[in-house]
Amino acid sequence: QMIGLWMVNPKAVGTSIAIKGPPGTGKTTLIKEGVSKILNRPFAFLALGGATDSSFLEGHSYTYEGSTWGKVVDILLKCKCMNPVIYFDELDKISDTPKGEEIAGILTHLTDTTQNDKFHDKYFSSADFNLSRAMFIFSYNDESKINPILKNRLYKITAGGYENKQKCVIANDYLIPK
C-alpha cells in the first residue's frame, strides 16, 4: 500500500518501515531488487550490527584532523538525490550502551517526519539536510532489543522463514544459476 502511494506520488513525504524476520529470508533482496527498483530510486545499505558510536551516522566536526561527514550525508552524495531508499540492516544489533542509545536517538530523529527536514551532520554544522522524502527501511530479528520510541515510529512487516523444501527450490532456481 505504501509503495503504491509512492509510485503514484513520488514527492510524497518519506516513510519508515521495519521488516522483522529470521536471517536468510530475503529482506535485503526484497528492498534492493524490489522496492528501490519499483520506485526507481537509488538503494543505500547501512549495517548497524555492532555499531557503537553515533559519529558514523552524523560525522565529526570539521575542526578535527581527519574528520569527515557521516554515512547519512555520504549516502546523499553518492546517490545524488534527496530521496533514496536507505536500508538499515540489523537494527536490533546496535550496542546496548549509552553510545548505542545515541545511535537510536539519531535514527529516531531521522524517522520523525516533523523534524527530519533539518538533519544536521556535525561536519557541515551550519547546513540542514532535508531527509523528509527519503525512505528509511530497517531490518531486525529480535523486536525486544529495539528502542521503544524508535520502534513506535516504524510500520512493521513480518517476513516468515522457509521450509526446507522451499529453500531447495530457491537455491536451485535462483541462487545456483547466479
Language-model segments: which ranges?
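Short regulatory helix/loop adjacent to the ATP-binding pocket of P-loop NTPases
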Residues: 99-100, 123, 128, 141-154
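Walker A/P-loop
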Residues: 12-47, 77, 108
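A short beta-strand-to-loop transition that corresponds to the Sensor-1 phosphate-sensing loop
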Residues: 89-91, 112, 133-143
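AAA+/SF3 P-loop NTPase mechanochemical coupling elements
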Residues: 79-83, 119-139
